């Protein structure tokens, strides 16, 4: 096992990374190795998928499988080794089906079919020991002694960014939104990685290409969310419980939540959101369900405490799951790409078992005094009052904007984001997105001339909204985004955040502060390139960084 894809990776050894029997995320070495092998297998599908496109052949089910398989390998998504064995078998069958279609097309047209090598020629071993032996040769650090840490780190940057792209594309796909150019870009990147690239410039350009592709994917997901559920609207969300039977929904998948709301209508069961599901309350088609009563708990890393105290069943719809404690192991369910050994997995939006569990559990005995927070400041809401915002800037009422967002986590140093937000002067506006918001979203920030000082833009994928807001302001002031009174203070944890970071870099956005630590796969040599080209810098002291951001604007 070797893995350093997330922020919580082990950094105590000579080389950062989890390389023991169990990673810091809870992933055991068998699962980690099978995930490495699944990525290898998916590269083989992509090699034939890319070839098939040149021959006019399409296999949409193969495209979709690539998204799903990649999603299962993200941090805190799937820990179920047996499911990865099954996915490996399915990957080989999928690859062979695409290859057979290429063969048939070549015969029909008289074209010569090239003999693809590497992952395209891989065949799964017959048993688990054999699969693990195969995995040992294809891990993320394969070739380290030959090509060096910089090349391995750049390959990891591309792969991890690609995982985030696939996750966002999967979210859009399950809502009925997909595009062939997105599948083509994803499979081209996987096929590129299948060649074991060693050219620094080619790797950096591929990373930026993925950033551009991810912008397209986030735009598609934005269209999917708004197309299915309406544009986000500023909405008050209850954060105190209501008496009655209850189900808690965590993760990111709005489609799963909608299906559950439909199935629980009229049952007397109240539904609560958790973690990154909080923005669901801002979508009209979801907020219209009266039994979507509120949000419970905090960010993903608080789930063991939150879930233990919740008096009903829990549904995990996507990342991020942590090892379930005995207090709730029998009442947590997974769906979609999520998995944990011994936890019941629900398929095809059939939540009848979950609903029966809710009816059998006590629920909340009493209604607590009402407490609310406000969400729903996506691009439609903010750009709808753009004139008011622009006038406030011109009048000197708004001096600066801060985007303080991204993934939260349990590592020391994340209080920085709370301190930064709390210390932001009263004439500044804080935009936030992702679960990092839980560090300060219950604080009273007030408003500036009726404009809330804290604007919750949405989930991590709503970085697209934040980008649209920033570019609209730049257009209004006839300047570039880097010339705006805007600072990006980003908290990263996993591969979706890596994809968003690549998008920001591809857009030429500079001087991003990133923390709480820099990615372990970003070697000093690669970091020098990112600093030189993009001005990326690690977070430091909140007060000093805040002063530097404001002084940069003044200068």
Curated annotation (Swiss-Prot):
Its cofactor is [4Fe-4S] cluster; hybrid [4Fe-2O-2S] cluster. It is an enzyme of class 1 (oxidoreductase). GO terms for biological process: response to hydrogen peroxide. Its main location: cytoplasm. [4Fe-4S] cluster binds at residues 3, 6, 18, 25. Keywords: 4Fe-4S, Cytoplasm, Iron, Iron-sulfur, Metal-binding, Oxidoreductase. This is Hydroxylamine reductase.
